[in-house]
């Protein structure tokens, strides 16, 4: 990894007036030019991290670094970051041009340079021609674009976005997800985005930090976090999940619902108690006799792109299935899935333990594969 643009080293935050601990020993490094998301429910600590970077809050302990420089004691206006708030914080008495130009005027930039950079910023956010428009005559999406143009006008090293899409309707929010992601890639500026919406995080991010109760529970790419949740909280917070108690008999073999199934996970103790996760979209409906499991359909809802089916197996476990095929309430159906669809979670495993286990397991697999290849090559040489 190159030198991080932002780094948190053992950062904690306690509100002194009531003793509430909102961040607990946070450590991470952010690379330049990527889109990062802090994802969590209300009170998880995600906005606190954003406010610490911006300088709106002070850390109780630990170091915060911007481009290698410790910024704990650097005032807000001296930090090379800009924040886009949920409310956008635009000046209603100013035009679009005046709002975007405001940070440059504070720095006493020359008039011609202001005009040039405002024009470039408005082009970037597709608001060319709106220079003289008053803020009150803009739609929600247009106001957000103005706020983003103002955020990038000073060419900051980092743009911080505090749930900027939450006030928009669903269609506009989806459109702005594409626009924000495209803008970040064109600018090459590091974006740090805060949201409670897991779909936003999955759609827009290069890297996600899942937060709960003041801690980073898991971090990784959207695919990694969705496909390999570290624990029950992440599995239920990121998407829909079927989660069942299980026993890891040995590498590649897991037992749940009284049956044994092939899996792709390993690196655990023999007969270790675990949990399995199977996503609803990974379950295929079959004839009862052809399924690995048999379940009884209880209810179903049409979600537009699929039917959401709720069923129960003979042990009383509830199953959610996403299928393009309609089921009949009360009927028995079979469920099929592949070893790759079964995700194994250890109980009470930390992210550090999870990462170390995966790394050790991958290295062991690669070593074993290398030995097998060497034996095969030696056998071929002897035969020839």
Curated annotation (Swiss-Prot):
PROSITE patterns from the UniProt entry: ABC_TRANSPORTER_1, ABC_TRANSPORTER_2, POTA
Cellular component, GO annotation: ATP-binding cassette (ABC) transporter complex
One GO MF term attached to the UniProt entry: ATP hydrolysis activity
SMART domains: AAA
Localization per record: Cell membrane
Keywords: ATP-binding, Cell membrane, Membrane, Nucleotide-binding, Translocase, Transport
InterPro entries: AAA+_ATPase, ABC_SmlMolc_Importer, ABC_transporter-like_ATP-bd, ABC_transporter-like_CS, Mo/tungstate-bd_C_term_dom, P-loop_NTPase, Transp-assoc_OB_typ2
Family membership noted in the UniProt record: Belongs to the ABC transporter superfamily. Spermidine/putrescine importer (TC 3.A.1.11.1) family.
Subunit structure: The complex is composed of two ATP-binding proteins (PotA), two transmembrane proteins (PotB and PotC) and a solute-binding protein (PotD).
Function: Part of the ABC transporter complex PotABCD involved in spermidine/putrescine import. Responsible for energy coupling to the transport system.
Record protein name field: Spermidine/putrescine import ATP-binding protein PotA
Annotated organism of origin: Streptococcus mutans serotype c (strain ATCC 700610 / UA159)
């Amino acid at each position: 990894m190159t030198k991080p643009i932002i780094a948190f080293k053992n950062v904690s935050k306690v509100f002194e007036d009531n003793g509430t601990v909102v961040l607990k020993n946070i450590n991470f490094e952010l690379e330049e030019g990527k889109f990062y998301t802090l994802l969590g429910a209300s009170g998880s600590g995600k906005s606190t991290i954003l406010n610490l970077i911006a300088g709106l809050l002070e850390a109780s302990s630990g170091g915060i670094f911007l481009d290698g420089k410790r910024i704990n004691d650097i005032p807000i206006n001296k930090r090379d970051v800009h924040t886009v708030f949920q409310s956008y914080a635009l000046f209603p008495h100013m035009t679009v041009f005046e709002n975007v130009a405001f940070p440059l005027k504070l720095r006493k930039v020359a008039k011609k340079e202001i005009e040039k950079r405002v024009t470039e910023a408005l082009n970037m956010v597709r608001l060319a021609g709106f220079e003289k428009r008053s803020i009150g005559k803009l739609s929600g999406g247009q106001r957000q674009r103005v706020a983003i143009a103002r955020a990038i006008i000073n060419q900051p090293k980092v743009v911080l976005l505090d749930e900027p899409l939450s006030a928009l309707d669903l269609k506009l929010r989806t459109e702005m997800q594409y626009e924000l992601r495209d803008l970040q890639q064109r600018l090459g500026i590091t974006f740090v985005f805060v949201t409670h919406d897991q779909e936003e995080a999955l759609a827009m991010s290069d890297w996600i930090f899942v937060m709960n109760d003041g801690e980073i529970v898991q971090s990784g790419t959207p695919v990694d976090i969705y496909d390999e949740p570290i624990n029950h909280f992440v599995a239920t917070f990121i998407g829909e999940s079927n989660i069942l108690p299980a026993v890891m008999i040995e590498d590649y073999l897991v037992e749940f619902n009284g049956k044994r199934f092939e899996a792709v996970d390993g690196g655990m103790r023999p007969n270790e108690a675990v949990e399995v996760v199977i996503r609803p979209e990974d379950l295929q409906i079959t004839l009862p006799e052809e399924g690995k499991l048999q379940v009884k359909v209880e209810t179903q809802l049409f979600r537009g792109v699929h039917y959401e089916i709720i069923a129960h197996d003979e042990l009383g476990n509830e199953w959610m299935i996403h299928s393009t095929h309609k089921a009949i309430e009360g009927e028995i159906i079979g469920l099929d899935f592949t070893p790759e669809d079964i995700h194994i979670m250890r109980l009470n495993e930390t992210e550090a333990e999870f990462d170390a286990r995966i790394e050790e397991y991958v290295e062991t697999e690669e070593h074993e594969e290398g030995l097998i290849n060497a034996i095969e090559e030696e056998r071929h040489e002897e035969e020839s």
